[in-house]
């Protein structure tokens, strides 16, 4: 057998089937774009369903691929077994009604045993077939020459997922030798059994029946072939290593983790699990982010968040307590660059996403673990071995612990999690969100009289701000009326209207309806269930009557402000993509006459430099005076043009395309300027985060931008006055004052250090001796944890050999720091364990290394008790 790299095996497979007349299908994105039934692409055949179900006829009925895939249904096994993965590659060859069993079997054998290809020893291969698949049995025995004793009939060799195509399958197994199993009395020691010796390397599915709704099977008119070979498993056999993780697909990642952690792979089962989890999960996350997924609390994003946080949890077991996964992205990119160059091309972006997610979790991790520790203690005190759904939800909602992560921590403590209770809390949260989203004024969800009105109403407001129209219906309090009088609030439907109804983030127009008989002040416009514009207003004078002819007039000054802000929003959207990356997508917007608000997906903070660049681009496009073209197009044509569509929006067959020169193109039903020069000026007023992975920009245009700049200048002039400086010298004056302040702070710190040394010297006389070891536990004055650690270090230096645990109370919270010298560690004492125990008494948590550790708590009144408990712990060890 040849020695081959994983890249060589992958390419060899594709080359072999290309020689056999197969079209090589590119590896599709992990994020399915045309299959709503899938969260991820999870197999080689998943991307070819369109061919197998007849929706699309392939140019070539013979297809092969190497398809990246994600499965997370048994994530808890990843890292604990030799071959479970969340990300893997499937090599497959497929026939859509072309060749069948004979060719599939012959070619599989040729690829595996020919010296030109893999070159396996044929005597080490066995096969399994379905008991009733005589055709496959005969082909293996007579055509290929496999001895009967190595052809095993198994009932399980039938591929069936319910209604639809199904059929028998045959699997090929490689004998890895007696070192992986030699007990002849083991009932599972055979190809197809649960053992490590006979490893399945290829599965050939013969799709020849249709599974009918009544449970019967009938032959398919066109028979198909669907095969799958796991690259990771195949490479483990070729490279003669015990697990998939020992192949060249994983080992460079594991070596990098060794460097980061200072630990070694292959020493203990617990450590190896951590190495494997990290190596597997970074591959999954890197590829998923490369294909457009981002961490979040829903769907695919939740999977990524769960994987990253699971990796962080295992990293702690090999002493990695900082964000580090992002450092592994270049390693993954280098391993996979030959076939998947996209990962290397997006390496910086992927690392940025992962680093941001890691940093967010680390901010809450220790506090969350402290809460979990309290919860576990509370339940044990009650005699319970289950964590309540309410507590699990709190850890999820407040500290970012995926429920599965809490389950793993609970399992370590021999406890369970109330899943049903957690789901109930989640449903309560969803209900709260639904209630918050409900717009009581929304016409779209109302039935009654409005729902029964079918008469047509035409919107002419794209071209005209006035129109002569008939009042076709009047409503008050949800009921149809024939007239409304002065002072009444009324809803009016017109046969023709220039008023824009609130939608797509753009607010409704305001204005008037006038005639000789009546004047109505229009305050709001919404869409009725059947699409008509419903004008809500107050009768200022006269009487409104059904059938009356009125002049409908939009307040032009308000509309002008709205269109400036709406077109500016489109420019902003594209500028965000240009500066931050193509992952940016609109997550919400509000456009009114005074300002615009734009919510967008982004994984980290936007820097001042990036904001400045975004603002500059938008203004440059405004000053270029670009024409804005608006056309109606078939949706397919619009998408081919590259028009941005909003995720979750429903579009008809014909869509409205708004194009700003060759810079921006979006599907949009709103109102816009004719030329960007009309906007005048664009100024970002604020940028902030509004949720995980979502940012918000508020901006102003035209006169509003001028006023914003004037306000900022006024603030600058006021600051200059307070600083007794001119405006140009304000930065220098601030820098000078900061330098003076730092000097004062340095003097204060020097005084504090001297005081600490003095206090440390004074408490040396309180050292006790337990079992021949110096022990010092004391409550001290320390302004923060850094100050406390410095005191511990000073005392360690003075004592030379000792156990030191100091506690301090600051702003109602407890800080605890511990230090243990090396010689005492060898006697069995561990700073991390001592500090954890003390912190738990104070209602907190923490830990650390054997020589140095720190923790926090919430109950300062229990600090003395906690410090006393440390002495008891030392006695129990010594």
Swiss-Prot record:
Cofactor(s) the protein requires to work: Zn(2+)
Top-level enzyme category: ligase
Listed GO biological process terms: alanyl-tRNA aminoacylation
Subcellular location: Cytoplasm
Single annotated GO MF: ATP binding
Gene Ontology annotations for the cellular component aspect, listed alphabetically: cytosol
Catalysed conversion reaction: tRNA(Ala) + L-alanine + ATP = L-alanyl-tRNA(Ala) + AMP + diphosphate
Sorted UniProt keywords: Aminoacyl-tRNA synthetase, ATP-binding, Cytoplasm, Ligase, Metal-binding, Nucleotide-binding, Protein biosynthesis, RNA-binding, tRNA-binding, Zinc
Region (Disordered) location: 846-866
Comment text on domains: Consists of three domains; the N-terminal catalytic domain, the editing domain and the C-terminal C-Ala domain. The editing domain removes incorrectly charged amino acids, while the C-Ala domain, along with tRNA(Ala), serves as a bridge to cooperatively bring together the editing and aminoacylation centers thus stimulating deacylation of misacylated tRNAs.
Function according to Swiss-Prot or TrEMBL: Catalyzes the attachment of alanine to tRNA(Ala) in a two-step reaction: alanine is first activated by ATP to form Ala-AMP and then transferred to the acceptor end of tRNA(Ala). Also edits incorrectly charged Ser-tRNA(Ala) and Gly-tRNA(Ala) via its editing domain.
Similarity comment: family membership: Belongs to the class-II aminoacyl-tRNA synthetase family.
HAMAP family xref list: Ala_tRNA_synth_B
Protein's name according to its UniProt entry: Alanine--tRNA ligase
Organism this protein belongs to: Bacillus pumilus (strain SAFR-032)
Gene name of this polypeptide: alaS
